[in-house]
Amino acid sequence: MAAARGILLKGYNALEILSDLFKIRQSFLLMLTGMLGYLIAGGLSIDPWIALYLLIALSLTIFGTTGLNMVLDADIDSMMARTKKRAIPKGAISRGRAALISIAFLVIGLWISYMINLWVFIAGLLGFLIDIPIYTVMTKRRSWTSVIYGGFAGGMPAFGGYMAFTGHPTPEALILLILVAVWSNAHIWYIVIYNYRDYERAGIPMLPVVKGVRAGVMGSLIHVFIMLSLIAIYFILAGFRAWVTLIVGGYLSLRLIQIMMRHLNGVTREEAYRTFKFLSPYLALVFIAMFIDSVLAI
């Protein structure tokens, strides 16, 4: 902790600032999908040491990538009410120091990923390459399609977690990757609808801002249909035995479809807030259901 205080600006709590820099809630969800990906693949036949290495690798690569994203987006964050109190915009840590910490975490995380197996390393590296150069630098400020690319970065922890057990890509691993990617788009578009003025003021070309709120709802609705399809495909790949996944994922998806169909005729800010809150636990619940099915199938 003393070392951490040395790289932060005076007057701020080191743990709080680092938690803010690494967007700890979002990072925890990505770490959870990665660990659950490993558990889904292995059921009860996992290696505790691999699980520990994977947890460390996921934590460091996700923290490092997230921190670099915060460094590059600090100017945008300073313009939005929702984000202007983040660590860098409020002056709790400089961009240079934040970048240094983030790069160190990323490099160590990728090194540990490689120790697990090559495919876990590839997943971690792809997560960084998609999120930072492609999403943050090249497309976020230019096109509303940026979040579609960014979503695949968010799916890499689950993809890598699954391959930590299998040692190679599988159709099931791809299902997890794509499920996270499409969920993240539906989720963020409803966040944008709720915080519409913030995104408009910052000049970020998100779908609801560029094409209209109805287009944002329609885009989210299409992605939920894709999520439902992925649940059905996973059920088939599991030999028609993943009943918990089918019931949980099917119910949540159909409920979201019902809600979003109503929003095509208009959605209030409060309704958008309730919907993205409903979307928030979707991934965790579906992944837990998949793990239960994996255990029951043994």
Identify the residue ranges that each predicted region occupies:
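C-terminal ends of transmembrane helices
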Residues: 130-144, 188, 194, 205, ...
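Small-residue-rich segments of transmembrane alpha-helices in multi-pass membrane proteins
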Residues: 32-37, 86-89, 148-165, 214, ...
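Membrane-embedded alpha-helical segments that form the functional core of polytopic membrane enzymes
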Residues: 32-74, 81-82, 106, 110, ...
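Hydrophobic alpha-helical transmembrane segments in multi-pass integral membrane proteins
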Residues: 159-169, 227-234, 282-298
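Multi-pass membrane catalytic core of lipid/isoprenoid biosynthesis enzymes
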Residues: 82-122, 212-238
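Interfacial loop-to-transmembrane junctions
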Residues: 257-285
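Intramembrane alpha-helical segments
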Residues: 95-165
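Cytosolic, membrane-interface loops and tails of multi-pass inner-membrane proteins
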Residues: 2-13, 72-93, 189-217
